[in-house]
């Protein structure tokens, strides 16, 4: 099974146990991962600048926060796996909430959730990670709009922004496009 076939809202509709097996495993993995030394190097570099640094990331793992970066200086353009939303927001609500109480139990061999499916706090239906997936018309981006607004405000104050792009691929070019916009003529988001 390819990444795009499980990393989409339809997977939660067709096989929620498998979808949550995949995302539950990722959630647990990210919770247990300690940020590597590169995060500390970036943090120290950012502290050398008068206006500090601002993180633009497509990673959904929360590692920048875990590494001690200011959460008010992070824009997670694809959301966070540590936040949940209703799988059917048009039928329920567009609220999000932290996944801190979720403790998924996963059968690693089958990649299936063996514990109870996470439920929407508002309607009791299926919950899903609040991350932008492939073919995703239901992602609730509202929590990240405030992050984006803070980034835009910060960029207006920086005369010559230094962009350090790490690990940005070609398959999903969101980070590369952002870097190019900042580098070319100081364009904003």
Residue ranges and their predicted role:
Residues 1-189:
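Conserved catalytic alpha/beta core of Sir2/sirtuin-type deacylases, generalized to analogous enzyme cores
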């Amino acid at each position: 099974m390819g990444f795009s076939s499980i990393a989409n809202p339809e997977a939660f509709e067709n096989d929620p146990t498998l979808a949550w097996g995949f995302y539950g495993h990722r959630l647990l993995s990210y919770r247990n991962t300690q940020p590597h030394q590169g995060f500390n190097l970036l943090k120290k570099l950012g502290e050398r600048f008068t206006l500090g640094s601002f993180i633009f990331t497509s990673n959904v793992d929360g590692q920048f926060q875990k590494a001690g970066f200011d959460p008010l200086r992070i824009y997670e353009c694809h959301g966070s796996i540590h936040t949940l939303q209703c799988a059917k927001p048009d039928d329920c609500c567009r609220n999000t909430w932290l996944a801190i109480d979720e403790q998924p139990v996963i059968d690693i061999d089958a990649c299936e959730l063996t514990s109870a499916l996470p439920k929407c706090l508002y309607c009791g239906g299926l919950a899903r990670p609040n991350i932008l997936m492939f073919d995703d018309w239901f992602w609730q981006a509202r929590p990240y709009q405030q992050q984006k607004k803070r980034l835009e405000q910060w960029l207006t104050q920086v005369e010559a922004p230094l962009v350090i792009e790490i690990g940005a691929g070609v398959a999903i070019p969101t980070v590369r496009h952002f870097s190019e916009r900042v580098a070319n003529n100081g364009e904003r988001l």
